[in-house]
Amino acid sequence: MTHAPTPPAASNFLRPIIEDDLQANRFQGKLWAGKPGPAALQAQGQPDPARIRTRFPPEPNGYLHIGHAKSICVNFGLARDYGGVCHLRFDDTNPEKEEQEYVDAIIEAVHWLGFDWQADGNDNLYFASDYFEFMYEFAEALVQAGHAYVDEQSAEEIRASRGTLTEPGTDSPWRDRPADESLLRLREMRDGKHPDGSLVLRARIDMASPNINLRDPVMYRVRHATHHRTGNAWCIYPMYSWAHPVEDALEGITHSICTLEFEDQRPFYDWILARLAELGKLARPLPHQYEFARLNLTYVVTSKRKLLQLVREGYVDGWDDPRMPTLFGLRRRGYTPSSIRLFCDRTAVSKSDSRIDYSLLEQAVRDDLDPVAPRSVAVLDPLKLVITNHPEGRSETCSAPRNPHDPQAGVREFPFTRELWIEQDDFREEPPKKYFRLFPGNTVRLKYGYVVRCTGFTKDESGKVVEVQAEYLPDTKSGTPGADSVKVKGNITWVSAAHAVPAQVHLYDRLFADAHPDGGDKDFLACLNPNSKQTVQAWLEPGIEAVPGATWQFERLGYFTVDSKDSRPEAPVLNRIVTLRDSWQAA
């Protein structure tokens, strides 16, 4: 059913526009026949149950990325907040680049992000290709009304005649051909009688317009290509600038929300809708286009061409590589749908281009996971610690909260034994100033366990420390009376060497070391971060169930998730989602 109005989560420049439209009853009397269609069909409909209609219109020629997530959240979020409906529409007007694989992936990604398009008994999943017959019918009507003509100039000639920002264009020699002659040529184009690029249908507007987009823009081109849905039924395909307003109007869209690069196209958008409404082809009220700044992140590229190059040339391990900005990459990295929605909600919807710092995305997933992620311990760079006065073969139980934010989550238990694994960084033979962890003679607390005093260490032939020895103080076990009688400045994490679970851990970081890898004339490949992926053999706290998608906060280290692709029950593979705090330093 249609979403009930809910208080908006955040403000942006589109909200006052929608609120003014609703207050002015701009859409009062708007009819909806239960499916998209022209004016004649909608006239048979009922009052539209949706207060507003928006749409997310991806082209099925690639995988969705974090920039698309912003548009998804804006369009679905506004529909939700104002008692409306958001359509998912595939803009499949370019058959040579589109595939069913991408359609399926986009549907999966939008669902994963937490949005649905069903409402009032309608699926609201649409394809531009469903409207090809309407578009062609409308094109003929425009030709007959003198608003369009078939041009036989080459693409180069059309480009040359367009003029410049300071000089008007020149009329095509075919601009004033009789309407019936253009109609005949258009039908020949439709019937496949002309080769690719030989003829185009152009709108007849104004070759002297200061807006180059109104200098008789192309509406249809000949393209003998197989479409992933319509097969070979069509050999002419609409240009996006012609298809876009028609699709919006057929679907009863009220607020067509685009990114800023379409701002200059809005006059043509309005022109198309006005002419077709005058001809009785489209129902009023007509859609209106609004533009907002696309989401640009530092340390990220979202160009499909560049992302494809990264995949094809092996710089990443596919479209779902956890370093990729694709939604599937973020999902595999361990980002939750709610964390991405939170990030999008925290970024402004404005008319001004800007770059959002990547750290805001990382902070969103921290804020999302912190209240819910169970705690555990992992040792990523292990060093053996032997408690020399602890009996061999003896195992004690220590306990810790599963989640300090949720007392109902209970406690977890794990063994304390003579031999432990600690982090290499938690020992120094010669400590620097203000180093409070293990070094000869120093005392620290093994978190949730005992206070220990370092008594020695062992090196291998290369001089590397391979083992540390310590004695524990039996009366200092955490959670027991008198445990705090010995004051220490350092706490370190540990796992039992005999019980820890071995795992491969991928330490992911930003894919690019340059904040603006696609800026200016840079070679974006030269900006890659050589340390964006490091793999270590780690030891995990026993009791961890390494099922795909499971997520933990490993204390002192960050948030980690089980890899959905490579992990196996007998050989866990984990991905670092994000560190506990922002400590980024460019390579």
Curated annotation (Swiss-Prot):
It holds the Pfam family tRNA-synt_1c_C. Its main location: cytoplasm. Its EC number is 6.1.1.18. GO terms for biological process: glutaminyl-tRNA aminoacylation; glutamyl-tRNA aminoacylation. A motif ('HIGH' region) lies at residues 58-68. L-glutamine binds at D91, Y240. GO terms for molecular function: ATP binding; glutamine-tRNA ligase activity. One of its GO terms (cellular component) is cytosol. ATP binds at E59, P60, N61, H65, I66, G67, H68, A69, K70, S71, T259, R294, L295. Keywords: Aminoacyl-tRNA synthetase, ATP-binding, Cytoplasm, Ligase, Nucleotide-binding, Protein biosynthesis. PROSITE patterns: AA_TRNA_LIGASE_I. It is found in: Cytoplasm. A motif ('KMSKS' region) lies at residues 301-305. Signal peptide: none annotated. It catalyses: tRNA(Gln) + L-glutamine + ATP = L-glutaminyl-tRNA(Gln) + AMP + diphosphate. Belongs to the class-I aminoacyl-tRNA synthetase family. Monomer. NCBIfam families: glnS, PRK14703.1. HAMAP family: Gln_tRNA_synth (MF_00126). This is Glutamine--tRNA ligase. The gene is glnS.
